[in-house]
C-alpha cells in the first residue's frame, strides 16, 4: 500500500474535521441532548407527582363525599325525628282539644237537659194547679199557688 501525499492530506483534513467537530459541534449537541434528557426526566417526575396528587385528591374527594352523605343522612334523620315529635305534639293537642270539646258538649247537653227538665217540672206543676183549680172550682190565692208549685217541683 502506497502512502502518497493525497492520502496524508486527507488524513490531516479528516483529523482536523474530527477535532473541529469535537471542539465546536459536539459540545452543543451533547448539551442539547442532556438538557432534553433532564427536561424529559423532569416532565416524567412532574407527571408522576401530578398522578399521585390526582389520586390523593380523588381519595380526599371520596372521603368528603362520604362524610357529606353521612351528614346529610344525619340531617334527614334529625328532620324525621323532629317531624315525628311535632306530629306527636299536634296529635296530643288535638286529643286534648277533642276531649275538651266533648266535655264541653256534654256539659252543655247536661245543662240544657236540666233547664228543660226544670221548665217541664214548672209546666207540669202549673198544669196540675190549673187542673186542681178546675176540679175544686175555685181559684187559690197567688201565694198558696206558688207554695203548691214549689212543693210539686221538689217532689218531681
Curated annotation (Swiss-Prot):
Gene3D superfamilies: F1F0 ATP synthase subunit B, membrane domain. Pfam families: ATP-synt_B (PF00430). Keywords: ATP synthesis, Cell inner membrane, Cell membrane, CF(0), Hydrogen ion transport, Ion transport, Membrane, Transmembrane, Transmembrane helix, Transport. It is a single-pass membrane protein. It is found in: Cell inner membrane. It comes from the Bacteria. The chain crosses the membrane at residues 11-31. InterPro entries: ATP_synth_B-like_membr_sf, ATP_synth_b/b'su_bac/chlpt, ATP_synth_F0_bsu_bac, ATP_synthase_B_chain. One of its GO terms (cellular component) is proton-transporting ATP synthase complex. Belongs to the ATPase B chain family. F(1)F(0) ATP synthase produces ATP from ADP in the presence of a proton or sodium gradient. F-type ATPases consist of two structural domains, F(1) containing the extramembraneous catalytic core and F(0) containing the membrane proton channel, linked together by a central stalk and a peripheral stalk. During catalysis, ATP synthesis in the catalytic domain of F(1) is coupled via a rotary mechanism of the central stalk subunits to proton translocation. Component of the F(0) channel, it forms part of the peripheral stalk, linking F(1) to F(0). F-type ATPases have 2 components, F(1) - the catalytic core - and F(0) - the membrane proton channel. F(1) has five subunits: alpha(3), beta(3), gamma(1), delta(1), epsilon(1). F(0) has three main subunits: a(1), b(2) and c(10-14). The alpha and beta chains form an alternating ring which encloses part of the gamma chain. F(1) is attached to F(0) by a central stalk formed by the gamma and epsilon chains, while a peripheral stalk is formed by the delta and b chains. This is ATP synthase subunit b. The gene is atpF.
